[in-house]
């Protein structure tokens, strides 16, 4: 199945890195990370195919309610609210998948692999509300 949406939880670091995601050929929704200093440059780079906002970003996609943030702040509060089917965060750069009650928590790790030496993404199947970590080469 084709990609319907790319969600990025921050730390593009530079606009040139963000532009590479246009090659995926699907829309992108993103939040700024703490290493995204060039905010206007990122907004401009993503404008042709996506958008980037200050976290947290709430969105509905394919019948699921998403919360996207860079740092997993107030995670217990968001989980207790039961308002979200999927919560995506990234600050630690460590891949993580877990389910808390009815909410799927996803940390895709880091695409670039600059800190951990491992380039990873998470792939979500919205029909089954399941995800897997994929290691890129």
Feature locations, PLM:
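Mid-chain, well-packed structural core segment of small domains
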Residues: 55-83, 87
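Short, structured coil segments at secondary-structure junctions
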Residues: 24-25, 83, 101
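Core catalytic region of metal-dependent phosphoesterases/phosphodiesterases
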Residues: 1-60
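Active-site neighborhood of phospho(di)ester-bond hydrolases with catalytic His/Asp-centered motifs
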Residues: 5-11, 29-34, 67-70, 86-91, ...
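Active-site environment of divalent metal-dependent phosphoester hydrolases
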Residues: 13-16, 35-41, 73-78, 88-99, ...
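Binuclear metal-dependent phosphoesterase catalytic core
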Residues: 53-62, 99-137
């Amino acid at each position: 199945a084709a990609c319907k949406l790319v969600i990025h939880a921050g730390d593009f670091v530079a606009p040139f890195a963000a532009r590479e995601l246009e090659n995926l050929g699907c829309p992108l929704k993103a939040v700024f990370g703490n290493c995204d200093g060039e905010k206007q440059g990122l907004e401009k780079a993503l404008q042709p195919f996506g958008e980037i906002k200050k976290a947290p970003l709430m969105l509905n996609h394919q019948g699921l309610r998403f919360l996207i943030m860079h740092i997993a702040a107030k995670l217990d509060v968001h989980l207790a609210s039961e308002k979200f089917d999927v919560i995506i965060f990234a600050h630690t750069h460590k891949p993580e998948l877990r389910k808390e009650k009815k909410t799927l928590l996803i940390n895709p790790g880091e695409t670039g692999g600059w800190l951990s030496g491992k380039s990873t993404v998470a792939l979500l199947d919205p029909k089954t509300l399941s995800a897997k970590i994929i290691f890129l080469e």
